[in-house]
């Protein structure tokens, strides 16, 4: 069921995704950077990836253990929901809501609400719904209700969706992000596409580098990871806004 580092009561950032390796591809740099700043980070993988074309669920589990060490997360959980058959039901919402209550994250990172892979689309809405359900005291009343403050959608490789609300500068941790992705050799070695990564004819690792460089260029840095939030962002002092117009 994935690598369990320790039991805990609160995390700052919880990344939730459909498959092992999704987090590494879309927001791995942000998790690494956050952990280095002293933030408590964790991951929930909704499925074990048992129907994937390459590798096996067992092998991907071992690969995720190695990647988790690089990401610096303090806990990684696998819910064991059906791969390629993920559903958003009262039962799956309650199961995920229980983990959200246990981990008590301030911020949750989810996939985009639109995507190429059916599991990713279902996962995005399932995560939003489970975060809401986690705050309803009468659902699984034996566990204290809790609701995260913020949901962010990781937008990497989804340029056909919406413009990012913001981009995290991952220039100083990009090589570590790439090493975490490379832990999934069964999925990515000699691959040219995966999940939301469209094929360009280049090796997948090169596509990740080029895409990260593109997002970094939007904020005038070397590498970046894009995010979208349904809420308008607050600014207290416009004189401190970064990213020059010229």
Give the location of each predicted region.
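Metal-dependent de-N-acetylase/amidase catalytic core
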Residues: 2-14, 90-246
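Active-site rim/loop-helix segments in enzyme catalytic domains that contact anionic ligands
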Residues: 1-103, 240-243
């Amino acid at each position: 069921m994935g690598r369990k580092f320790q039991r805990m009561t609160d995390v700052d950032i919880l990344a939730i995704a459909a498959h092992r390796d999704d987090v590494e591809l879309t927001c791995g740099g942000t998790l690494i950077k956050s952990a280095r700043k002293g933030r408590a980070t964790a991951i929930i993988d909704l499925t074990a990836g048992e129907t994937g074309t390459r590798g096996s669920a067992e092998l991907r589990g071992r690969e995720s253990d190695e990647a988790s060490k690089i990401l610096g997360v303090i806990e990684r959980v696998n819910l064991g929901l059906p791969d390629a058959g993920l559903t958003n039901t009262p039962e799956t919402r309650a199961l995920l809501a229980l983990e959200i209550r246990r981990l008590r994250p301030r911020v949750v990172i989810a996939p985009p609400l639109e995507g190429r892979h059916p599991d990713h689309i279902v996962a995005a809405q399932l995560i939003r719904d489970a975060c809401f359900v986690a705050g309803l005291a009468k659902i699984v009343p034996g566990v204290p209700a809790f609701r995260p403050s913020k949901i962010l959608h990781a937008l990497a490789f989804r340029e056909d969706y919406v413009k990012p609300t913001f981009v995290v500068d991952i220039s100083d941790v990009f090589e570590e992000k790439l090493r975490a992705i490379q832990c999934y050799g069964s999925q990515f070695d000699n691959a040219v596409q995966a999940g939301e990564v469209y094929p360009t004819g280049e090796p997948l690792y090169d596509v990740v580098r080029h895409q990260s460089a593109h997002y970094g260029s939007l904020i005038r840095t070397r590498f970046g990871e894009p995010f979208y939030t349904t809420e308008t962002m607050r600014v207290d002092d416009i004189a401190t806004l970064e990213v020059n117009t010229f």
